[in-house]
Amino acid sequence: MTALGAYGISACGLFPGKTFTDDAAVPEKITAVRLDTGSGGVTLRGGKGGGKVAVHRSVTYRGDRPEGATHRVEGGVLVLGGCGKDCAVTYTVELPAGLPVSGETTNGAVRLTKVGKVDVTTGSGDIELDGVAGTAAVRTSNGRITGHGLSGKGITARTSNGEIDLTPTTPQSIRAETSNGAITVKVPKAPYRVTTRTSNGDKNITVPHEPSGRFHLDLTTSNGSITAGQVRTR
């Protein structure tokens, strides 16, 4: 399916481009996913597709139409690649739940649902985590970071410009850092050591600080408020 793209800001920049979309089934057994893209967002939906892997992509380009697949499989790892100069590829992938995800994208939002361990970076774009079952380490230079239903053994979230909002479902240590934006965390009841730093903003901390607590909440922003509370349980 092919369509002319509209004028405006796209992942390729400010230009009129052409866009096409396609779908591909991945027959190989996939044990992990690695992001290796330039411009374009990535959405991974774990637990979809009945255990199979399906790759949907939307490619916006200027000049000659890019040919061939932009994803590949290396030793069981699904690698989501880019499409070259003046081109952006946006992925939506359905895959089994619990697969680890790593890698980076230069420019684009990253949305991960029901995956395993996460270690990803985007140069510019929001990062959204939902139902992550492993340790999560995420970084963006310009974008908001949100995470809900996180059940791993630790969270590290860093952004230079954006808010951070995290709600884990299991007690774990959290390190959240932003240069410009508010930080909000809501954690299950557990013993926490609480460290907060802000140069310009209010603090609303209702999580009890226990110096010998097993878990550590380390929250830092240069410009923004910090809120740390406990999730209400019935």
Regions inferred by a protein language model and the residue ranges of each:
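Short acidic/polar N-terminal linker immediately downstream of export determinants
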Residues: M1-R65, C83-T92, D202-S212, T233-R234
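Right-handed parallel beta-helix
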Residues: T21-V26, R65-T135, I145-H148, P208-R234
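A broad structural signal for short, well-ordered beta-strand segments within beta-sheet-rich domains
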Residues: I30, V115, V132-A133, G152, ...
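Active-site alpha-helical segments that house and flank conserved acidic catalytic motifs
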Residues: V33-D36, G103, V120, V138, ...
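Solvent-exposed coil/turn segments that connect beta secondary-structure elements
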Residues: T60, P96-G98, G125, V132, ...
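Short, surface-exposed interaction patches in beta-rich subdomains
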Residues: G147-R234
